[in-house]
Amino acid sequence: ASEWAQSIAPLEFLISKDPENVGYLTQLGNAYNKLNNTTKSEEVFSRLIKLEPDNKDHYFYFGKALMEAGKYSQARTQFLKASDVGNGWALPIFYEGFLYEQSAGGCTDFDRKVVYLLAQNTYRKALSMDSNLSEARDRINALSGAVPTKEDYFFRGIKSGQSMPITCVGWIGKSVTAP
C-alpha cells in the first residue's frame, strides 16, 4: 500500500499542471481506491465521467471503487451504466452478480438461496452476453448447490413460474422466478 500512498502527491502535482489528463486521473482514482479513500476515489471517477461520459471504463472502475467501499446499490448503478455505455459489455454484469452473491450472507437459509439464485441468473446473463467470460461459468457452477431445490419450493408451496421478491437485502429490490 505504501507505493500507492507515495503515488498520490506526484499524480496530484501532474494533474495540477494538466487537470484534464485522463490517464493521470485514472491512476489517481485507482490509487485512492487501493488506499480505501472512497471519498477521494469517488470524486476522481465522477470527474472522469464528466470529462468522458462515453468511456465505459470510468463507470466500471467507479463501480469497483464503490463495491470495495460496500456501497453495493451505487456500485450496481455504475456497473449497469458501464454495460450500457459499452454496448452490452458483459464484465460489469458479472460484477452485478458478484454484488448479489456477496450480499446473501446476511439472509436466512431460504432467502439466502433466493439471493444466490439471483446472482446465478445474473452470471448467466453475463455469460449470454459474452460466452468467453469463464468467470461467470465458474460462479454459476459454484452456486449450483446453494440455490433453492425442488424440495425447498415444494415445502413452501411455491409453484414454477411464481415470482419471489428478495426482501432480506433492501438495496436489491428485485424478484426471481421459481423455475
Segments from the language model and where they lie:
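TPR/TPR-like (Sel1-like) alpha-helical repeat modules
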Residues: 76, 80-86, 101, 111-134, ...
